[in-house]
Amino acid sequence: GPEYTTAENSQPSGGFIACPQSMRAFTTADVSSTTVPAWVESYLSGLNAEGATYHDIGMIWGARMASKRGIMAANVNDQPYRSASRHLIFMTDGALQPNRYAAGNYGIEIFANRIAPQYTNDLDLIPYHSARFRAACDAAKNEDLVVWMVAFGTAITDDMRYCATGDRVYFASDTTQLRAQFRTIASQIASLRLGQ
């Protein structure tokens, strides 16, 4: 398979150079409906589990996309005269699973040393990424985002409970339950919208 090489090391990459599904810019959704929009169904169907799950980078990008001050501000603030609640739905299909040999947003962890000290093992990387995840969750909530957590086929963790706004934490063991949970979330957002 492919390899990566540095002056000090060469390592077969195996499945550690995954290209995740690209983010999707905000799209207008019918908040009066309890059905999951077709574009969400299609997007979710295209997701593939590759391992090396990083909750922190997912939350960082979710918050960046929804921030009124962030790189997507023009999209977020396109109708400033409307008082819209903003919701971030964070779904994961795996427990936090950093891998020091995985190519990620900040390079290959064992060589880049941007998250933890060099040669930190996979298990010892978890507290670093957990702390970053919680900090990203705090930042998202400080941006007045309502954070919903969905655990798909994986256990709900203390980090997920910490991150969610209130008790907005959901579990789904299969796609039928996942669709049901998204319908529940959609109906609650619609109720919030109608009540404001």
Specify the residue positions occupied by each region the protein language model found.
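P/S/T/G-enriched low-complexity
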Residues: 1-196
